């Protein structure tokens, strides 16, 4: 904990946990049978049992920041809300919440489709895509001590502009500040599966719509699948499942109509509701982990879940106190009420909704490690059955705790057992524990909804476990940490396509090391990649990592667990780079059929990730390669006359935090020339994100001067030509590119070309970062296995580096460096 002057007030996690425990105990003192600070601290200590999420962890008992304890909010205006005034109001509310440390979600289905008549100077509506960009830009502007805001934008598949929404992020650099998800109803899914037409309309829920449009459901579904395969977005939200299972929607007429989700998708919310998150560390309930005597302690787990639910209810009270402080600060601000009135009214609405429902978000982390510690393999039916038992126990214990609190503290304001009587989740609880249901009818429940499963990425770093219900990413992996732009001392290893900087480091998964110790392996020894692979094969993590788990079984597991989670589950299905779109389609359809409320696909390499696998080639493929006769490598012959057309790869890179593009012309698959320049709508070249290949066409004008054009095909097969590459780019960069193209043309080996580029002594900082981008663009063409002569491994100091898939790999110690 620190203040705005940089003064530090805590020196250890113990200090932080005592701060939290003392505040929880203070709230407990208001109610019967209070927990002591020591009881709470013992569950928090060493992140062993219960772990509050980032906002509660940072904000509880922190008087140095005027901020909310809520992790997530959803906003949205009632009634007709697609006027410019309403759109601007949502934009302002989004920013006001983000500056208080909250992630925000909102739905765009209320915005009129493109071309609709409007009563202003434009005469027709622009549709929802321009407003996606506005909300995205607002998110990126909000500085949260070096972090960006988090935003979820959603739209109903029924909206006539939903196809434009689905395509909005396919152009590189567009809507970079938001996650996007499509709300898909059962009718659309069935029509897509059966290849039948589907009717879109606006307003989407109107009995007398102003706009109707019949489309091919399968064609639009195929686009969703393709875009998810290409760029990991959009995510899909199975909206009928969400509404059907939602307990808060039993009170829809009282303001609890679910309209969107938080940025990660695990909490569907109504407008102006919010949620605080906490997770229970499942690994800590495995007794004798990684041994034949291992078992899960259900009794201890149920006892701790009950306390966790109680703590979460206390945090609702703490949040209401924080909201009062925020509102007092707004009152005291020197601006006029005209300026600050909107923010004050926003927090009034949030306070009202929070006190009405007292929503909580008790979740879990370390599911993957729990399964491994019990000697099971993630993705098997046996492991899924165990997980369902654990989550059923969690749901019953949390709801029993909420019912007990209703008896002691009072039920949430609008509780009505009759409204909930037909809810599928409540009926499952009734069947599993009839006495719990009877008590709930008699006394009510303290919280309108209780459970979720969040990604818990940063939380899992504290617990040193797998995150959420995910399997281990890799037992050994490279991790990226986003760098605070205000921190001048940090080392930057990677800059993504939108200019955010990251530090990279190699990580051994802690629980994998625990397994190694339990099975007699030396954890101090430096292993080669081959040795690590051999060790992993003997462990319960084998064939149970993010990239090689049974993906279909993982989706079915999510659906089975979802039956015992009243909110939703945030899960990403990680896929290798070489999977096809048919698999993505199959996984999405299975997610719908299995009862998942949402699903997100990430194909390795489809966008910049936080963790990067250092994967080996498939063994069968390697064995086939080894069977081939060894042919001496022969340099391609020099071609004196350039063909009129050359195949071309498009490679994007960062130059001093600007988005640049390289066009690499290929002759027989070998780089022949390179053109580089700014990718910009005004001064450079604007290309859709999906364009990765094309042609460079050389034309000679009447004056005898050569001109180079770039041609590509769009998704529908139509060709687009960008004329005059040389005229589009800065002359200084153009001249350096001509120099590099000259040595490529005369077949200097690529690794030597890269050394030449690296040795250029250039004074301008921009040109120096440009040459690094050129090096990266060319490295992918180095033949795998080429030795990096004269270079030493930074880890072991040996001259044993070889190029592999554009990266430098050490044959001696297995260390790797990309970029």
What are these model-predicted stretches?
Residues 814-819:
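Short Cys/His-rich micro-motifs in 6-15 aa windows
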Residues 184, 245, 250-252, 262, ...:
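Terminal amphipathic helices with adjacent charged low-complexity linkers/tails
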Residues 21-33, 41-120, 128-131, 142-145, ...:
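Function-dense linear segments that define catalytic or interfacial modules
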Residues 437-439, 615-664:
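Short, Gly/Pro- and small/polar-rich lid/capping loops
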Residues 265-267, 319-320, 426, 439-446, ...:
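Catalytic alpha/beta core of large soluble enzyme barrels
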Residues 1-34, 120-134, 144-256, 287-291, ...:
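Conserved, charged catalytic cores of large soluble enzymes
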Residues 41, 202-204, 208, 304-351, ...:
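Internal maturation/activation junctions in enzymes
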Residues 793-796, 810-813:
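Short cysteine-rich clusters marking metal-coordination/redox-active sites
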């Amino acid at each position: 904990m620190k203040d705005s002057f940089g003064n530090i007030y805590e020196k250890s996690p113990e200090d932080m946990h005592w701060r939290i425990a003392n505040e929880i105990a203070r709230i407990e003192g208001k109610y019967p049978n209070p927990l002591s600070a020591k009881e709470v601290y013992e569950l928090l200590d060493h992140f062993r049992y219960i772990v509050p999420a980032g906002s509660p962890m940072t904000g509880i008992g922190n008087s140095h920041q005027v901020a909310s304890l809520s992790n997530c909010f959803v906003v949205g205006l009632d009634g007709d809300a697609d006027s410019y005034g309403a759109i601007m109001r949502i934009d302002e509310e989004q920013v006001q919440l983000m500056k208080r440390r909250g992630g925000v979600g909102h739905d765009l289905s209320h915005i009129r489709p493109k071309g609709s008549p409007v009563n202003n100077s434009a005469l027709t509506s622009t549709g929802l895509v321009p407003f996606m960009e506005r909300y995205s830009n607002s998110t990126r502007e909000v500085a949260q001590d070096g972090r960006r805001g988090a935003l979820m934008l959603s739209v109903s598949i029924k909206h006539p502009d939903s196809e434009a929404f689905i395509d909005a992020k396919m152009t590189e650099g567009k809507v970079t500040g938001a996650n996007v998800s499509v709300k898909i109803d059962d009718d659309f899914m069935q029509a897509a599966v059966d290849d039948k037409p589907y009717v879109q309309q606006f307003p989407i829920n109107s009995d007398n719509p102003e706009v109707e449009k019949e489309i091919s459901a399968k064609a639009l579904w195929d686009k969703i699948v393709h875009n998810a395969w290409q760029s990991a977005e959009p995510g899909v939200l199975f909206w009928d499942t969400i509404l059907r299972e939602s307990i808060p929607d039993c009170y829809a007429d009282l303001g609890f109509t679910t309209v969107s989700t938080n940025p990660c998708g695990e909490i569907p919310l109504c407008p102006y509701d919010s949620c605080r998150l906490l997770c229970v560390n499942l690994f800590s309930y495995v007794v004798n982990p990684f041994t034949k005597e291992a078992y899960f302690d259900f009794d201890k787990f149920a006892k701790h879940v009950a306390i966790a639910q109680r703590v979460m209810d206390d945090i609702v009270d703490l949040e209401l106190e924080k909201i009062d402080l925020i509102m007092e600060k707004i009152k005291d601000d020197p601006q006029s009420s005209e300026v600050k009135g909107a923010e004050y009214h926003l927090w009034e609405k949030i306070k009202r909704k929070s006190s009405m429902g007292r929503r909580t978000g008790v979740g879990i982390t370390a599911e993957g490690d729990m399964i491994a510690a019990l000697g099971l393999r993630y993705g098997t039916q046996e492991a899924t059955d165990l997980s369902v038992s654990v989550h059923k126990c969690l749901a019953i214990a949390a709801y029993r705790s909420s019912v007990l609190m209703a008896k002691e503290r009072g039920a949430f304001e609008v509780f009505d057992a009759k409204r909930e009587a037909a809810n599928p989740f409540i009926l499952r609880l009734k069947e599993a524990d009839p006495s719990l249901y009877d008590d709930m009818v008699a006394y009510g429940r303290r919280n309108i909804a209780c459970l979720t499963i969040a990604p818990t990425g940063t939380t899992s770093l504290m617990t040193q476990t797998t995150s959420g219900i995910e399997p281990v990413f890799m037992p050994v992996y490279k991790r990226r940490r986003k760098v605070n732009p205000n921190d001048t001392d940090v080392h930057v290893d990677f800059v993504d396509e939108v200019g955010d900087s990251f530090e990279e480091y190699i990580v051994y998964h802690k629980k994998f090391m625990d397994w190694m110790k339990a099975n007699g392996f030396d954890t101090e020894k430096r292993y080669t990649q081959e040795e690590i692979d051999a060790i992993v094969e003997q462990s319960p993590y084998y064939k149970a990592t993010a990239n090689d788990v049974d993906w279909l079984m993982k989706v079915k597991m999510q659906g089975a667990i979802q039956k015992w989670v009243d909110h939703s589950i945030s899960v990403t299905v990680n896929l290798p780079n070489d999977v096809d779109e048919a698999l993505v389609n199959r996984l999405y359809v299975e997610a719908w059929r299995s009862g998942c409320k949402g699903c997100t696909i990430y194909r390795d390499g489809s966008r910049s990730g936080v963790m990067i696998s250092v994967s080996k080639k498939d063994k069968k493929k390697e064995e086939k390669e080894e069977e081939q006769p060894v042919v001496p490598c022969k340099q391609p012959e020099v071609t004196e006359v350039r063909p009129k057309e050359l195949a071309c790869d498009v490679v994007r890179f960062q130059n001093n935090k600007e988005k640049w593009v390289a066009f690499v012309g290929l002759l027989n698959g070998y780089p022949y020339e390179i053109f580089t320049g700014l990718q910009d709508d005004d001064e450079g070249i604007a290309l859709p994100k999906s364009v990765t290949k094309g042609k460079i066409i050389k034309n000679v004008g009447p004056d005898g001067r050569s001109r180079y054009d770039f041609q590509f095909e769009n998704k529908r097969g139509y060709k687009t030509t960008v004329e005059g590459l040389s005229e589009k780019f800065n002359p200084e960069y153009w001249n350096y590119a001509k120099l590099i193209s000259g040595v490529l043309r005369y077949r200097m080996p690529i690794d030597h070309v890269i050394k030449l580029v690296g040795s250029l002594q250039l004074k301008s900082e921009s040109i120096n970062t440009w040459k690094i981008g050129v090096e990266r663009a060319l490295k992918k063409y180095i033949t795998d296995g080429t030795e990096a002569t004269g270079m030493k491994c930074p880890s072991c100091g040996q001259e044993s580096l070889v190029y592999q898939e554009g990266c430098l790999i050490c044959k001696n110690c297995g260390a790797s460096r990309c970029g």
